[in-house]
Amino acid sequence: MRKLYLILAGCAAAALAGPAVKPIVQYLHVPVAMRDGVRLSANVFLPTERTRVPAILVRTPYGKGDGITPNHLAFVEHGYAVVVEDVRGRYESEGAFQPLTQEVQDGDDTLNWIARQTWSDGKIGMMGGSYVGIVQWKAALSGNPHLKAIFPVVSGYDDYRDRYYSTGGAMKIGNRLEWMAENLRAPGYHQDFGQFVLHLPVRSADVAALGWTSPMYREVMEHPAFDGFWRAISTREQIDKVRVPVFAVGGWYDNFVQSDLEAFAALRPRSGVNRVLVGPWAHNMSAPFEHVAFGPDSIVPVRELQLEWFDQWLKGKESPLVSQPPVKIFVMGANQWREERTWPPAEARPRLLYLESGGKANSLSGDGTLSEKAARRAAADQFVFDPYIPVPTRGGAVCCNPRVFPWGPMDQRPVEQRRDVLVFSTHPLKRDVEAIGAVQAVLFVATTARDTDFTAKLVDVFPDGEARNLTDGILRLRYRASLEKPELATPNEIYKVTVDAGVTANVFLKGHRIRLEISSSNFPRFDRNANTGGAVEQAPQLVKATQTLYHDPTHPSCLILMVVPGKE
């Protein structure tokens, strides 16, 4: 049933301070028909002027509510229609929720529906974060002519690497199960996060988290490698279909940041209009970190940027954004914004820091070092990886509820006390080192297992000893050559592998130390490898593996940072 209201926006959003505002028109719970007959439910908010206006579309799985939010109100007052829609299978929308496959067509159909309305001028933009950002990428794949610009926040553009698995093939078990439990659990069912992430086999962890079997989750479990299933749905694999201007926003401690930056780099050669902004944030940009503050300059007026962006592409008003460099990143350590023409910055150059020890790099008390000089000693380090006692995740780019699964920068010294964590550090720096770009660990490793994992974490060590995590990653050894074609290892054979440890922008200040942690688990950020060589998601039991890291003249294991000259 469609209802029409004429309300004073200032009364509907009493939390807003300031002068009296214009009245708006709102239609609540409007049915929007999809091509298969399923009806989605939308709220429509309009200016009172009887003219055709451009529209902002927000498609959400989190519930559109029964009224307008202060953020959406600002767009109506600025002359936009705002349409907020429950995606298929969520809240008041019909159908089954199939997030892997439904959003391209449903986004396309909703855009066409808006364009047909008497209040619409046919020009539409989309905005929102997380899943609400992902659906923007999906709608853009449709090539709908009415979609003129998108503004995805903390969303990424690849289902495999961002939402479910990772650049190294391990599953983001904590992220995925926590999101599912928050949003999809059966009514009245509850189990603690710390319990359901431990469930074995991983394939049936959906029941532990939700109280029911999720077809979506089971389908993901059937495709642990990057196969045709993922290629068919990945925006990353179809990025040439994205023809609209994109303003992407990410955070250095967000799960999607690497993908946000890669998307910009992929789009930029084809169009000079796209932009990317990355700050010192986690998945919720407005949530402060508990123990770390990056200063008042780290706060960005995102709504103002959105209004400028949509005024440019939906109303034809020239924006100051046009004359500014398209990349804006916050450099931690210096706590300053930096503008660039490209990502990665054109002036950044690889800096290799070689791992070395006397064979006792285990823990913070060990003898592991990082140096620009290649290792001279023929020593190696060993540790035992017991997946029943994994290295715990301590902050980082995790998602999506910090009360349950804490995110962001944290002191890593409790983790570095463990014997199954190898610690390599530089001497205190004699000058600042500005690292902006990808972080990689090139390692020469052997294992007693047919398959196992290796992790790498970049850490900024302060003069007082605080060890602040910057970024991290993992490699499932079977994917050492390719995510598409897994290959089991030969026990005790030495392999050269590259662990993709993400991206960062940080000045390691004079007197600080650069540190690299190497281990075989980071749980529950990533699932635990069973170390058997079998299907990890089906393993009912886990076994130990003995890991060896080589770093000598023949096996030059190293950390690779992209360093910007001028700070040294």
Model-identified regions with their sequence ranges:
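Active-site-adjacent alpha-helix of alpha/beta-hydrolase-fold enzymes
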Residues: 258-274
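Alpha/beta-hydrolase fold nucleophile elbow
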Residues: 118-131
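Cap/lid segment of the alpha/beta-hydrolase catalytic domain
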Residues: 47-116, 163-166, 171, 287-294, ...
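C-terminal, loop-rich substrate-recognition/catalytic regions characterized by aromatic stacking residues
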Residues: 197-202, 277, 291-568
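N-terminal cap/lid segment of alpha/beta-hydrolase-fold proteins
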Residues: 18-50, 425-431, 444
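Accessory cap/linker subdomain of secreted extracellular hydrolases
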Residues: 77, 138-241
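Proline/glycine-enriched tight loop/beta-turn segments at coil->beta junctions
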Residues: 38-40, 47-56, 120, 241-242
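Short beta-strand/loop motif that positions the catalytic acidic residue
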Residues: 242, 248-250
